Each structure stands twice: as structure tokens, then as C-alpha cells.
Swiss-Prot record:
Binds 2 heme b groups non-covalently. Gene3D superfamilies: Cytochrome Bc1 Complex, Chain C (1.20.810.10). Heme b b562 binds at residues 83, 182. It comes from Crocidura shantungensis (Korean shrew). This is Cytochrome b. One of its GO terms (biological process) is mitochondrial electron transport, ubiquinol to cytochrome c. Keywords: Electron transport, Heme, Iron, Membrane, Metal-binding, Mitochondrion, Mitochondrion inner membrane, Respiratory chain, Transmembrane, Transmembrane helix, Transport, Ubiquinone. One of its GO terms (cellular component) is mitochondrial inner membrane.
Length: 379
């Protein structure tokens, strides 16, 4: 008798994706982040669902309802902080996952990579709208500043912003629709993640060497299930420590002040995971130029497969490219730091240099480095 997991219509999909899936024998812990992102998404949907049971998306009561969740709901504080810090863990895993893809040349799987970039955009949109919901000072002013950027679009900009706001300023209509979108988007993200996996399983996983691994495959279960569980335990421990010891470490104290349209906070800044893009936005003195740079800073990931000039797929055997990659990582850390600083000398200049360098490394320096390495292979 054939095993039920190989014959049952639903079970065989699970079987071919998570049990009998042929996986390269040499994939390192950098390949754990896909499963960690899945765990993050499930955790965010579940905690978000329980928060939505007690939250009210009305400007008069939103802030109070979040306070009520933290004070009066059983373990409401835990659910709220798991959700808020879970978003930070989500982005840490996302950035590491994308970084792994860049380093090991996983972007050569075009469909998987492009859907991944779409996923990144969708998660960023979800996180932005979620930040608005508590209706604190930073929620309100963050929403005002970021949505206002759309007014830079020629001709239709102003109408577009007022259409998104549902009025002439960020108000009740804006909060209600942001709540609706924040609720539905994670399910769209989950569906996209399914398509992401579908395309990945068409080709099979890449591996650190970047070479074809068809001759040396092992089943996903038990080898990588146990490895993923270890990764999950480490992530859950980190998240638990963050939530239970310093839940507000990554948040902004201004968000504990109820939204006041008559009082602007001294420094408007988004959550830490958007600071690199915010720094790029601020480094261009022109509004439309800034918005374009902001979008392109993420959209540039789409054209990375076109910029691959190396003869080897992975950076594992390309020391010069490795140096450029780590300089890019350092540049992103610099941008993140600058995004959280006030707009004054020397931060403005550092931000402008780091922004130029970011695009220069990706568009010019890395492809040229790869070409030089190709020549060195002949020696």
C-alpha cells in the first residue's frame, strides 16, 4: 500500500514541499530565513487577529483602545508587544534573506526573485499602515508625511493624496481604510509567499557554491526540518527576550502621546526598518526626485539579475565582490543611522554621500568588479 502522504490530493502537496522535497546537501544556515519568515507571518497574522478583536479604528478611540488592550485585556500587553516587535523580527529576517540572495546569486531564479521583491514591497506597505493604527503622534505625522509624498506626482498628485486621505487631511476616513488594508494585506502576502515557493520548487534551491546540485540531493525531512526548528527556537528566544525585557527599545516614545494635528514632533521618523530608505528620500532636496530615489532604492533589486556580469553565480569564490558586498552592507547601516538623525550638518552630507554610494555600488562598482574577476580567472 502506498503511503497516504504520497497519494492524498492535499497531503501530496505538503509532502512534495516540506517532506520529500529534494534539497542540496550543503545549504547553510543562511537558507533558514525562508522558514523563519513563514513563522513570522503566521505569528503576525495570529497576534494581529487578536488585536483586531479589541481595536477600534476611530480617531476618537483608537489610542484609548490600544491602551485598553495593554491594561485590561488578558495578556493584551503581550499580544501587542509580540505584534510590534514581531514586525521588527520580520524585517530582520527579510533583510538577511535578501542579503543571502544577493551574496549567493539566488536572484538568477528570475520569477522567484521578482515575486520576492513584490513581497518586500507588500510587507513594507503593511508595516507602514500598521504603524499608523495606534494613532500616536508619530503614527499621525508619519502618515501625513509619507502619504504627502504622492503629491509630488505631476498633475494628479494632489487629487491622489486627497483620495487616499478621504478628505483634506489625515483623519477618521484615513485611519479606517488603513485598518482595512492592514488587515487584508498579510493574507495577500501569504498568497504571494505560496507563489514564491511554487516558483522556487520549479528550479530547486540554490546552494552556497552556486553550482548545480542535482547530483547530490537529500530529503528536506528530517535534515532541514530539524535545522529549521533550531533556527526557529533561536528567533523565538530573541523575540521573547525583546518583548519581555525591553518591548519599547525599537519604538518611538512620541507614539505614547495621542495624535495632535496642531503639534508637530521635533523629529518625524519612521520605524527603524524604513530608516535607510527615509535617509535616501531626505538626501535629495527636490520632492519628486526624493520620491523617485525612495522607490528606486527598493525597485533596484528587480534589475540586479541584469547587472550580473560574473562567470560564477555565487560570491563564495569571488573575494573582490565579497568586499564590495560588505561595503554595501556597511553603507546600508550608515543610511539607517542617518535616517534617525536630525536634518542638519554633517548628517545631511553623510546621507547624500551614502545615498550616492548605495546606487553607485549596485549599478556600477559591483558589475565592474565582477568583470575584473572574470579577467583574473584567466591568469
Amino acid at each position: 500500500m502506498t503511503n497516504i502522504r504520497k497519494t492524498h490530493p492535499l497531503m501530496k502537496i505538503v509532502n512534495s514541499s516540506f517532506i520529500d522535497l529534494p534539497a542540496p546537501s550543503n545549504i547553510s544556515s543562511w537558507w533558514n530565513f525562508g522558514s523563519l519568515l513563514g513563522i513570522c507571518l503566521i505569528a503576525q497574522i495570529l497576534t494581529g487577529l487578536f488585536l483586531a478583536m479589541h481595536y477600534t479604528s476611530d480617531t476618537m478611540t483608537a489610542f484609548s483602545s490600544v491602551t485598553h488592550i495593554c491594561r485590561d485585556v488578558n495578556y493584551g500587553w503581550l499580544i501587542r508587544y509580540l505584534h510590534a516587535n514581531g514586525a521588527s523580527m520580520f524585517f530582520i529576517c527579510l533583510f538577511l534573506h535578501v542579503g543571502r540572495g544577493l551574496y549567493y546569486g539566488s536572484y538568477m531564479y528570475l520569477e522567484t526573485w521578482n515575486i520576492g521583491v513584490l513581497l518586500l514591497f507588500a510587507v513594507m506597505a503593511t508595516a507602514f499602515m500598521g504603524y499608523v493604527l495606534p494613532w500616536g503622534q508619530m503614527s499621525f505625522w508619519g502618515a501625513t508625511v509619507i502619504t504627502n509624498l504622492l503629491s509630488a506626482i505631476p498633475y494628479i498628485g494632489t487629487n491622489l493624496v486627497e483620495w487616499i486621505w478621504g478628505g483634506f487631511s489625515v483623519d477618521k476616513a484615513t485611519l479606517t481604510r488603513f485598518f482595512a488594508f492592514h488587515f487584508i494585506l498579510p493574507f495577500i502576502v501569504a498568497a504571494l509567499a505560496g507563489v514564491h515557493l511554487l516558483f522556487l520548487h520549479e528550479t530547486g534551491s540554490n546552494n552556497p557554491s552556486g553550482l548545480n546540485s542535482d547530483t547530490d540531493k537529500i530529503p528536506f525531512h528530517p535534515y532541514y526540518t530539524i535545522k529549521d526548528i533550531l533556527g526557529a527556537l533561536i528567533m523565538i528566544s530573541t523575540l521573547s527576550s525583546l518583548v519581555l525585557f525591553s518591548p519599547d527599545m525599537l519604538g518611538d516614545p512620541d507614539n505614547y502621546i495621542p495624535a495632535n494635528p496642531l503639534n508637530t514632533p521635533p523629529h518625524i521618523k519612521p520605524e527603524w526598518y524604513f530608516l535607510f530608505a527615509y535617509a535616501i528620500l531626505r538626501s535629495i532636496p527636490n520632492k519628486l526626485g526624493g520620491v523617485l530615489a525612495l522607490v528606486l532604492s527598493i525597485l533596484i533589486l528587480m534589475i540586479i539579475p541584469l547587472l550580473h556580469t560574473a562567470k560564477q553565480r555565487s560570491m563564495m569564490f569571488r573575494p573582490m565582490s565579497q568586499c564590495m558586498f560588505w561595503i554595501l552592507v556597511a553603507d546600508l547601516f550608515t543610511l539607517t543611522w542617518i535616517g534617525g538623525q536630525p536634518v542638519e550638518y554633517p548628517f545631511v552630507v553623510i546621507g547624500q554621500l551614502a545615498s550616492v554610494f548605495y546606487f553607485l555600488i549596485i549599478l556600477f562598482i559591483m558589475p565592474v568588479t565582477s568583470m575584473i574577476e572574470n579577467q583574473l580567472l584567466k591568469w
